[in-house]
Amino acid sequence: MKLVMVSGRSGSGKSVALRVLEDLGYYCVDNLPLPLMDTLLEQLKDSTELVAISVDVRNMHETELDKQLSNLPEGTELLSFFLNSSDEVLLKRYSETRRLHPLSRSKTSLKEAIDHERILLEPVSKLVDHYIDTSNLNIYDLSNQVREILLGSVDKELVINFESFGFKHGMPAEADFMFDVRFLPNPHWEPELRPMTGLDEPVQLFLSQQPTVNKFIWQIENLLETWLPHLERNNRSYLTIAIGCTGGQHRSVYVTEQLAKLFSQSKHTVQARHRELSND
């Protein structure tokens, strides 16, 4: 089992690091009390090989942490991070978000809470494998640093999901891009094609011979190829492109299949789903 532990000062980006780990397939637990670590690992040992936890100052003590890490189950590979930021940056972040610092009390100012946490966590910062100062990093920079440490590369695999649907059954709420193909020639009006779907060869042949269909597929491909690099740089994990026709049987299915084939030739992981066909 591989265990990644994320610790550090409140407001330094622990939740961002944990989201990166979740995107990489880790089972993540936020703010885990250290006494529960053994129980968690025991429960997960047969179901997952990748586990990530974050701990904050409220449930972390130097001696307790050292003891827990030295008594991990046999075969556990540990990688640890400590995230830090300057006092000035943390003050600014908390002032902007108006969140309550974990060590804030009724008579404790934000500055005093930040100072106190720095002192408490200084010994812990010396126990970890990777120390990251996030003072001058945005969330994308931090995500890339964590990913590079874990994978040796900042390249992120974007999963592209092409989904066909019928407008008469409602639009998919999860779509990032949506294209309406109801203006394209409709196989429904060809009696021999009506009972078929866009997965059947006669329908595919009919639509492949329509210049407007081919041009529209080319234009969608060109649009997506232009903007995919920008989406990847913003650390997108999934992209759903919905293609809709009237009933979700012919045109949208065909266009979805063609786009999925085109993008399967690239570095991306591509999925094709036909909502109305799967509901039959």
Swiss-Prot record:
Name of the protein: Nucleotide-binding protein Swoo_4243
Residues reported to bind ATP: 8-15
Function statement: Displays ATPase and GTPase activities.
HAMAP family xrefs: RapZ_like (MF_00636)
One MF term in the entry's GO annotations: ATP binding
Keyword tags: ATP-binding, GTP-binding, Nucleotide-binding
Top-level division of the source organism's lineage: Bacteria
Pfam families the record matches: PapZ_C (PF22740), RapZ-like_N (PF03668)
Residues in coiled coil: none
Residues holding GTP: 56-59
Family statement drawn from the similarity comment of this UniProt entry: Belongs to the RapZ-like family.
